[in-house]
């Protein structure tokens, strides 16, 4: 049975992306500098394309296309490791980067 492992490999923040000259200011008292939904190194395993428990539904919407591609035995020709890819959520202030790997029994 095919499964996917989704691992948090990087958490960004607005200052990493843009330096001190942010193109749009945010209210620091309303938002953490980095995403607080995930921890670096956190892993999720799924045997379908449903949202794993504890996974951000917004991030899932962003990476679901790549999850489907890898889950259904797709590969990307520019990625050396078959059955894997790197993706990120589209939060322009605090993106989270994920490694998706296919696990086959």
Regions found by a protein language model. Give the residues of each.
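Short, compact, well-ordered microdomains
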Residues: 60-105
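Short, Lys/Arg- and Gly-enriched loop/turn segments at beta-strand edges
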Residues: 51-62
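Disulfide-bonded cysteines in secreted/extracellular proteins and peptides
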Residues: 35, 56, 88-89
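Ser/Thr- (and often Asn-) enriched beta-sheet segments in non-cytosolic proteins
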Residues: 3-7, 43-45, 97-104
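Short, flexible N-terminal segments of the mature chain
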Residues: 20-50
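Short, basic/aromatic beta-hairpin or loop at an interaction surface
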Residues: 4-25
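Generic structural motif
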Residues: 9-13, 49-51, 103-105
């Amino acid at each position: 049975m095919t499964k996917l492992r989704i691992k948090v490999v990087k958490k960004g923040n607005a200052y990493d992306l843009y330096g001190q000259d942010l193109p749009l200011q945010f209210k620091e008292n309303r938002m953490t500098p980095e995403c607080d939904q995930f921890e670096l190194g956190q892993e999720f395993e799924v045997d379908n394309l449903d949202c794993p428990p504890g996974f951000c539904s917004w991030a899932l919407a962003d990476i679901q296309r790549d999850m489907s591609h890898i889950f259904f035995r797709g590969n990307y020709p520019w990625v050396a490791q078959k059955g894997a890819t790197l993706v990120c959520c589209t939060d322009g202030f605090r993106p989270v980067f994920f490694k998706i790997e296919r696990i086959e029994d």
